[in-house]
Amino acid sequence: MNYMHLGRAGTGKTTQLIERVIDQLTEQPLGPSIYFIVPDQMSFEMERRIATDPRLSGLVRMEVMSLRRFAFHMIRDYGNQVIPFLDETGTQLLLRQVVEEAEEELKIFKRTKNMPGFYKGLDELIASFKRSLVNPDMLRQISGASPERSPKLNDLALIYERFTERISDKALHADDYFTTLIELLPKADLSDVSVFVDGFYEFSLQEQQVLLRLMELTKDMHLSFTLDVEDVYTKQSEFGVSQRCYMQLIEQMKERQIAHEDIYYGQTVKFQSTGLRMLEQALLSPGYPPTDEEVTGVTVSAAVNRQVETEAAVRKAIQLVRHDGYRFKDIAFLVRHLEPYADHLERAFQLYDIPYFLDQRESMVHHPIVELVHAVLEIVMTGYREESVFRLLKTELIPLPAEDPRLALDRLETFVLERGIKGSMWKKPWQLKRRLADEISLTDAELQEELELNEWRQFLVEAIEPLEKRFKASKTMSEYTRALYRFLEEHHMTDRLTVWKQQALEVNELSQAREHDQVYEAVLLLFEQLEAAAPEATLTTELFVQMVETGLESLRFSLVPPSLDQVIATDYVRGRLQQVKVVFLLGANDGLIPLVEDQSKLLSEGDHDFLHDQGIPVGKASLDVFDDELYYLYQGVTAPSESLHISYALVDEDGKALQPASIVKQIKHQLLQDRPVKTYFAEAGDHAPDDQLQFVTSPERAAAAAAIELRRLQRRYPIQPSWFDVYNRLLENGRGRERMALFSNALFYQNQAEPLPEDLARNLYGDTIKASVSRFETYNACSYKHFARYGLRLKERKLYKFEAPDIGNLFHGALNDLSMNIKASGKRWRELDDQSCSNLAKEAVEKVTPEIQNAILMSSNRFGYIKKKLTDVVEQTAKMLVKQAERSEFEPDLFEISFGNAMFPPLRFTLPDGTEIEFTGRIDRVDQATIGDQLYVRIVDYKSSAKELDFAEIYYGLAIQMLLYLKTVVEQSEVLFNQQAKPAGALYFHVKNPMMRGDLSADEIERNQLLLESYQMQGVIVENDEVLRAMDQIAYDERKKSPLVKVTFTKTGLHKSHTKGVVKEEELTALMDHAWDELKTSSQSMYAGDIAIDPFDYQERTPCTFCEYRSVCQFDQSLGNDYRQLNPLSEKEVLERLKEETE
């Protein structure tokens, strides 16, 4: 006999079915089989519930299983042969192959086949066809009824048909199990078998056929449906999906003359609170009258965001367990869609130390062995790209042959990134090379490094080359799969994962150990699915790789069944909760409840409606979607027996405002008299006084909350006196005291770098400093940056990139080489013509190019183009230098001269503690001019970007290099020129190829004048009439504005407002002496251990803007850091201050 158990939620249907099972088991412990069929996620708890009943001593004749598991069980026992099972992954792999082969015949899906999720959507759609008993011919027959949908339906019919043909007898699709089961059931003797079916919201047409066949063959069968007994046979019922399913079954039972008996459950027995009883009646009845009674068991609250919402619910759960006698297993957290809340739930459970079961299967995609397979396939397909190579090596499943494999990997990666090694370069020996200008041989240590790098290179190539060769020889799916499997076995993946598993067990990381156990088995199962899908199919390497990657992305870790005392977190459509007393329903926001989502990635809402109109019930008609969502919600809110706590967030993770779901408004109106809801905030002090101590759930959380409140007090905000009691209690508890100190230190932390002890500073910097001026400028810009760079010696990893410093190096190298060639030829700059400049420039660039960033400008056509543009810049610059030389008495004489060696000694001084300071450097160019009997010198610094000499920056020690270089040349002039020289100035020259704008009608002379002016040098010049004349004879004689330097001559002298940087000789000396004093001052501070985080702020410019150490110093104005404000100073103000300081 067949029994239909019908009733609303909470009327005792499940309990009655269990009781009937227990009665049969107690009467006949060893009788005929009993199958209790439930949804998969309900099977473990149902079996535990029956097995732990004290009336039973065992479950010999009863099995609890899902319908799919029941099908597998029957096919295994009564099928004639073992057919490979094609799971979701195998199905998607086979579908990809079918689509690729049929690509030219497809109209719509030809364009969309490479979109993310396409094959998953196609798999779901074909599964839906099978569950709805739809075949390809049915799709073709209805395609004519809708011309606009005809191409899509024909594409689907073609793919579905080819897929069915391909799978045929070779493998069994997941949704073919039920078809096979129906054929096999008569072979099993089920005449004395009892079947109980419970917990399902709906059955597909395919599943209904299984149930009908069981009704015909078994002794008795019991099915439960959640319905209102008063309108069981009403076509339009509030119970949507369940009602439709029941009616479909009844109609088919009548057609097949299957007798049944309806058993009605009208009395609600589950709910222990007035609120839940009323909610069960009101939810599906919007017209349910509001109550004036004070209801219990139902609450609604809001929270500022999802994290706060989740933590508030978790704190409430802790209170229930600690103070109200509940156990964790009595509590569940429900959402409609788990993804927005999964991370928040997991974090909160771990934070508050709550045992939990999160009903979400994690992807395997980030496990090292999956990464390894991805990486090695990328290498085979695209060559030895650095991303693929190091993606493979960083899995540590194929460690480098070195004493410390991780250090070896870091060194190898550093070398590869710096040299831009890729592709075939991995298969050729590597050489460590110096700059071409450096003829020093490699040291023994460098030779050893070269040897080790080549050993690691060869190891990697030898590991991958066999797979490359096997792939080239492979043609079929089976050959490719076995080649990949052989690669994994050759590198002992099983052994390595076994070691990792054991290491995880030793530190009690059980979940990690389980992952290592599952993942290799899952990868091998994927290979089996590939072979099962199309073992002898011919395919390209590219297609095979795509299929493997599709499969890898679908791998998921299996869920561990919940323990005896854990809270459960799941979505209320998937979850099947039993004997739960309290439910926290999170995310009651519009858009999540009801959930607005596409049923299929491939069919639109209109497509679904069309199919339903044509009698093909694939998916759901749009009119049914909302009703079914409401029914799912009904199942969720009726899951608890004692209380339901609904909450929603006010904003999402992006700060976007969220609205409460319509259910919130309905419940507030019908049950809660529209009272305002309580809102939860992130900090305790934002709550009402009585609610603040809810944050005191453990010493850790209490300490965190108390520390925040104490910080409020520090900022002069009032706090509740109870927090002083919490603070004192924490100090009495060892664990609490430790946590309080930790949180207090964090909250009151000031990001300040304490001075180094002087002996430590000396150990870091040495007894003698031999350094460039730029090092001291760095110290004056920010002493902590200096400490990071020169004390800790932190460096960014060098990359094979062409950046601004490389451009500067090329300009400096080319101009130096060009200048030296001119000097060696015996010619003067002014004697060169344009063609000579072009030739010399090209030769210079060609010479220095191999020295720049590992010859990057020779690596590709793109960089070849960049090299040509840079050559143009050098050519144009050389021509302008000739034009400048024609107007000036200053002759370029020395180029790229380095001081700080035996030929050109450095300037040095001794600190009071005996520390020797020597400063070194390289001067781009020194010009000289003899005026009368006196030699004058000026220095010129080439810049690849515009630069002016700011007197205020000189005063603050930020731009002292040029002045110190000039001082050095003057003081060493006897060595350099065999006579004492006087300073004429220090100038910046901008190397560029300017885009000239102006009057197109201007003649060539005007255009040349404008071009020359664009190269005007900026800096400081001594105010001496003869020197100024030597700077630009033509402008001086014509009493005009000079295009060479920032000077304008008038009949009476200089035009002050159009002249910049011109100072008296004593003022220039004062500037040089001040730069020298700044050098001494910064040296003393450096050795005193001053490493303060004190970047300057000068005219909205700070050294932090492009600082590579920002992540080290953690500069943050909210943590006590601030900029050292430097006030702008004019040239006059600086010179006056220097004068005052020397008097």
UniProtKB/Swiss-Prot annotation:
Q: Per UniProt, where does [4Fe-4S] cluster bind?
A: C782, C1104, C1107, C1113
Q: Report the enzyme's class at the first EC level.
A: hydrolase
What are the BP-aspect GO terms?
double-strand break repair via homologous recombination
* Annotated positions binding ATP: G7, R8, A9, G10, T11, G12, K13, T14
Name a GO molecular-function annotation. 4 iron, 4 sulfur cluster binding
Q: How does the cofactor bind to this protein, according to its record?
A: Binds 1 [4Fe-4S] cluster.
PROSITE patterns tied to this protein: UVRD_HELICASE_ATP_BIND, UVRD_HELICASE_CTER
Keywords from UniProt, A to Z, are: 4Fe-4S, ATP-binding, DNA damage, DNA repair, DNA-binding, Exonuclease, Helicase, Hydrolase, Iron, Iron-sulfur, Metal-binding, Nuclease, Nucleotide-binding
Family matches, as InterPro entries: ADDB_N (IPR049035), DNA_helicase_suAddB (IPR014140), DNA_helicase_UvrD-like_C (IPR014017), P-loop_NTPase (IPR027417), PDDEXK-like_dom_sf (IPR011604), PDDEXK_AddAB-type (IPR038726)
Q: Per its UniProt record, what Pfam families does this chain match?
A: ADDB_N, PDDEXK_1
Question: What extra comment accompanies this record?
Answer: Despite having conserved helicase domains, this subunit does not have helicase activity.
HAMAP family documented for this protein: AddB_type1 (MF_01452)
Biological role stated in the UniProt entry: The heterodimer acts as both an ATP-dependent DNA helicase and an ATP-dependent, dual-direction single-stranded exonuclease. Recognizes the chi site generating a DNA molecule suitable for the initiation of homologous recombination. The AddB subunit has 5' -> 3' nuclease activity but not helicase activity.
Output this protein's name: ATP-dependent helicase/deoxyribonuclease subunit B
Q: Which organism is it from?
A: Exiguobacterium sibiricum (strain DSM 17290 / CCUG 55495 / CIP 109462 / JCM 13490 / 255-15)
Gene symbol here is addB
